[in-house]
Amino acid sequence: MNVNIGNLLTRRAALNPEREAYIDSSSDQRLTFRELNNRSNQIANQLLELGIKKGERVALALMNSAEFIESYVGIAKIGGVVVPLNWRLVADELEFIIKDSGTRTLIYGEEFLDVVTDLHGRGDKTDVRDW
């Protein structure tokens, strides 16, 4: 079996399910290993339903958050390649990274709605099939 962060989280959740895995001091959000594993499994399953296959690139336009970690791990669990996008970049820069990396799916947070709407409006220039 290939070892990746998804496999490691699954093992840790089995060993210490109630131990805290994530703490956000700015919002007091806390997740146990069981919760983080379950949430990343949900994302992995959603990506599989979209037809994402091992080796395909999935871009993340998310702030530093539990959602970023859950998505990152979910992508790893199915063998996808994470393409993290810097929140400081503008649409032209993001378009270049998305196209250059071969990204076919983009997961984004509401903070990125305006820039993603701009990118989506550019159509096939980005080759993203799932927004």
Language model segments and positions:
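Short, flexible loop segments at the rims of nucleotide/cofactor-binding pockets, characterized by
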Residues: 1, 35, 83-85
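Residue-level preference for short coil/turn positions at secondary-structure junctions
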Residues: 1, 16-18, 54, 99-102, ...
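A short N-terminal helical cap/helix-turn-helix that marks the beginning
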Residues: 1-22
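Active-site-adjacent beta-strand anchor residues
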Residues: 2, 61, 106-109
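Conserved AMP-binding/adenylate-forming core of the ANL superfamily
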Residues: 18-65, 69-73, 90-95
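Structural core segment of the AMP-binding/adenylate-forming
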Residues: 49-50, 77-131
